[in-house]
Swiss-Prot record:
Residues 1-27 form a transit peptide. ATP binds at residues 235-243, 374-379, 461, 476, 572. PROSITE patterns: AMP_BINDING. Its EC number is 6.2.1.2, 6.2.1.17. The gene is ACSM3. Pfam families: AMP-binding, AMP-binding_C. This is Acyl-coenzyme A synthetase ACSM3, mitochondrial. It comes from Pongo abelii. One of its GO terms (molecular function) is ATP binding.
């Protein structure tokens, strides 16, 4: 029976079990690879019965994490750690929920006392996958300070922009980026506190490791209203500077229960590994809120760079039951010989970030016996659509709407389109705004207003819904190619390209043409075995393959072989960069 979370249940800690445990605890059966959901019976009942009351006050640290500590002490949860960290040097950290609570309260006292931060002050966090990153997340929750994550790939210019535009009061980083911060700090009038995660001291910085040794673990969590701003995520658009996307204590702290309970299908017995970079909102999705609201263990491997063999070895060595990664990672993994790896505990694999092509899911299934359950969402949302356990997977589809949202395909006037017709993917926000949606773009009311059309929030993505209610991604609205009157989405062309044995990966954009206005151009990364082939002949073979695989008018009239595709830190292909280069605008 699907649990219903009511306002009364959320107001009282003693009722927390019904919020977080959502179904029975399951034991780990190493040979059990069933796709039967643990937390719901089927998609239809999940969608129909789901309710989530939003209390006036909510704080994830107090109302979720501390409640798991109480259950842990009472012996009412499995012995999995709350947090499990490893690195390539063989070092390992395991924290129970009680230890996570104690350490995060110490960190909270450092923020409040040593850094003199007040509720609502903003904290930029730029760290790789180190344990302190998770402590900082929880410490900000406890103090009511607003967390602003950033990737360690940020340049000095990027850091300056983020510090100035966010008006951040504190920054937390490491030895690598501290010099860049020091170089721009005089230009950031709101910045008054700097914490460094390092074995060494640095002038003008508080050394977190040393301060943690002396900090008290006695701290009272602030009482935050559900609609207070909890975090701000910088998200890049197709033009201009990155936007600041604001989320509240309820939009992510409660909203991501949808991800954890339904899409990830987590229980307290699970060990969840998400490979996302710490600077991406996907880490909040699958490395913090979704697993911990379900009482699951957050597992992470501090890999400085992507290494397919390290990922395969880790999945084989450790009792990871749920694995989440970007399509690019899965594509690179299946190119390896996986016969020697046995994933004895792995039961559930999910992917997000951009569409995953059917050829990758088929290869993964053939090599592991497991399906990949694709999910679709944005920095601005929790899970919008997904493939859920217990429902048929249509290869290439992003599944059906999550319980959080009423999703439709709409036209330019905000009218709902029938099945089969392409339009803009929208989420209904009137008359009642759903709980798992961002509040606004900070200091950018015009951009916030531009996302609304009629009764809908417009995602900026194009797609269609089929007769069975499955949603299909076509392209970002700005990625659609208009050629000789045809509208061509890059994903379908890329899907066809990637099925050719010579293609490791591809990206499709528009290219100027004097007759057709624009045509399809494919940037192709070749598999190693094909790099010595005659390129002109190979281009013809690839073009003919696409003509036979999809509608002939979609084939790439131009093909360019490149060494690698430009990617964002989350693994998404930067089609916009390729398109601008093609049109000579950069």
């Amino acid at each position: 029976m699907l649990a219903c979370v009511t306002m009364k249940m959320l107001r009282h800690a003693k009722c927390f079990q019904r919020l977080a445990i959502f179904g029975s605890v399951r034991a780990l059966h190493k040979d059990n690879r069933t796709a039967t959901p643990q937390n719901f019976s089927n998609y239809e009942s999940m969608k129909q019965d789901f309710k989530l009351g939003i209390p006036e006050y909510f704080n994830f640290a107090k109302d979720v994490l501390d409640q798991w500590t109480d259950k842990e002490k009472a012996g009412k949860k499995p012995s999995n750690p709350a947090f499990w960290w490893i690195n390539r040097n063989g070092e390992e950290v395991r924290w129970s929920f009680e230890e996570l609570g104690s350490l995060s309260r110490k960190f909270a006292n450092i923020l409040s006392e040593a850094c003199s931060l007040q509720r609502g002050d903003r904290v930029i966090l730029i760290l790789p996958r180190v344990p302190e990153w998770w402590l900082a997340n929880v410490a900000c929750l406890r103090t009511g300070t607003v967390l602003i994550p950033g990737t360690t790939q940020l340049t000095q210019k990027d850091i300056l922009y983020r510090l100035q535009s966010s008006k951040a009061n504190c920054i937390i980083t490491n030895d690598v980026l501290a010099p860049a911060v020091d170089a721009v700090a005089p230009k950031c009038e709101n910045l008054h506190s700097k914490l460094i995660v390092s074995e060494n001291s640095r002038e003008g910085w508080g050394n977190l490791k040393e301060m943690m040794k002396h900090a008290s673990d006695s701290h009272t969590c602030v009482k935050t209203k559900h609609n207070e701003i909890m975090a701000i995520f910088f998200t890049s658009g197709t033009s201009g500077y990155p936007k600041m996307t604001a989320h509240t204590h309820s939009s992510f702290g409660l909203g991501l229960s949808v991800n954890g309970r339904f899409w990830l299908d987590l229980t307290p017995s699970d060990v969840m590994w998400n490979t996302s970079d710490t600077g991406w909102a996907k880490s909040a999705w699958s490395s913090v809120f979704s697993p911990w609201i379900q009482g699951a263990c957050v597992f992470t491997h501090h890999l400085p760079r992507f290494e397919p063999t390290s990922i395969l070895q880790t999945l084989s060595k450790y009792p990871i039951t749920v694995f989440c990664s970007a399509p690019t990672v899965y594509r690179m993994l299946v190119q390896n010989d996986m016969a020697s790896y046995k994933f004895k505990s792995l039961k559930h694999c999910v992917s997000a970030g951009e569409p995953i092509t059917p050829d990758v899911t088929e290869k993964w299934r053939n090599k592991t016996g497991l399906d990949i359950y694709e999910g679709y969402g944005q920095t601005e949302t929790v899970l919008i659509c997904g493939n859920f356990k217990g429902m048929k997977i249509k290869p290439g589809s992003m599944g059906k709407p999550s319980p959080a949202f009423d999703v439709k395909i709409v036209d330019v006037n905000g009218n709902v389109l029938p099945p089969g017709q392409e339009g803009d993917i929208g989420i209904q926000v009137l008359p009642n705004r759903p709980f798992g949606l961002f509040t606004h773009y900070v200091d950018n009311p015009s951009k916030t207003a531009s996302t609304l059309r009629g009764n809908f929030y417009i995602t900026g993505d194009r797609g269609y819904m089929d007769e069975d209610g499955y949603f299909w991604f076509v392209a970002r609205a700005d990625d659609v190619i208009l050629s000789s009157g045809y509208r061509i989405g890059p994903f379908e062309v890329e899907n066809a390209l990637n099925e050719h044995p010579s293609v490791a990966e591809s990206a499709v954009v528009s290219s100027p043409d004097p007759i057709r206005g624009e045509v399809v151009k494919a940037f192709v990364v070749l598999n190693p075995d094909y790099k010595s082939h005659d390129q002109e002949q190979l281009i013809k073979e690839i073009q003919e393959h696409v003509k036979k695989t999809t509608a002939p008018y979609k084939y790439p009239r131009k093909v360019e072989f490149i060494q690698e595709l430009p990617k964002t830190i989350s693994g998404k292909t930067k089609r916009n960069e390729l398109r601008k280069k093609e049109w000579k605008t950069i």
